[in-house]
Regions:
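A generic structural signal for beta-strand entry/edge sites
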Residues: 26, 45-48, 106-110, 168-170, ...
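N-terminal cysteine/histidine-rich coordination modules
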Residues: 2-75
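Short acidic, gly/pro-rich beta-turn/loop elements at beta-sheet edges
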Residues: 60, 137, 202
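Surface loops and adjacent helix of pleckstrin homology
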Residues: 43, 62, 96, 194-195
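Short, solvent-exposed recognition patches
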Residues: 92-174
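A short, solvent-exposed beta-edge/loop patch
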Residues: 154-231
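Short, solvent-exposed coil/turn segments at beta-strand boundaries
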Residues: 88-90, 117-120, 184-189
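Amphipathic alpha-helical segments
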Residues: 78-95
Length: 231
């Protein structure tokens, strides 16, 4: 039986829990662009660093698909935390991730979902919202830079999502073995990454997205097993 609980998205995570969480970040944070281990701040610098990409926003270990995992992400989020609602038939929420620390807050959010591929077999979807320059979505897409890069939005959009009752166009980014779409919502990049690439047919129709930071909504969210696609 899939665990389901009604969700009031007002965060209820204790401050002490966040203290434990950031202790984990210090030990295991990685670069959002390449997933190499990140070097923690020192007495001389408050910045996290990657040996390849320099100063970064640290990516914490994936959070389990649960109410606690969701509330922990929403609590510190400075960017949207986006979930398709209603969920596509048969799909479950399968985990969360975020990039940021106590000083900056969460500047990139990732929500993972798993379900049936419209063309057959299983599929996974990561929805990432991030400030420009963070690089989590671009890293998953296999792009060399932190953002979509040259040529972005130079053609007609390939798909559309609806956020807060406003349509947001998305463009397809070339990527091996997966379908990657990216657009802009409220000055943040929004990436939808789907495995396998045939699961991109899920976006043949506009996909409505909810920002889970909105404290007025109550959603009965179904949780599944943790998705291995989460970085």
């Amino acid at each position: 039986m899939t665990p389901r609980r009604a969700l009031c998205v007002t965060p209820r995570v204790a401050v002490t829990g966040m203290g434990k969480y950031f202790a984990i970040v210090v030990m295991r944070a990685v670069c959002p662009r390449c997933q190499r281990p990140a070097r923690a701040p020192t007495a001389w610098s408050s910045a996290w660093r990657c040996d390849l990409h320099g100063e970064i926003c640290p990516l914490a270990p994936a959070r389990l698909p649960s109410m606690d995992g969701l509330h922990a992400l929403v609590r510190q989020a400075r960017v949207p935390v986006l979930l398709p609602w209603p969920l596509p038939p048969g799909w479950l929420v399968s985990g969360f991730a975020g990039a940021g620390d106590e000083r900056t807050g969460t500047r990139a959010s990732a929500v993972s979902l798993s379900g049936p591929n419209p063309l057959g077999g299983p599929a996974d979807l990561l929805i990432i919202a991030e400030e420009p320059g963070i690089g989590l979505g671009a890293g998953l897409a296999g792009l060399p830079g932190p953002d979509p890069g040259d040529g972005f939005a130079s053609s007609q959009p390939n798909a559309t999502v609806e956020v807060d009752h406003h349509d947001a166009p998305l463009w397809l980014v070339e990527s091996d073995g997966k379908a990657v779409f990216v657009g802009e919502v409220a000055a943040n990049w929004v990436w939808l990454v789907l495995w396998p690439d045939t699961a991109g047919t899920l976006l043949f129709e506009p996909l409505p997205l909810r920002d889970l930071r909105d404290p007025t909504q109550e959603l009965d969210v179904p949780f599944g097993a943790l998705c291995p696609r989460l970085p």
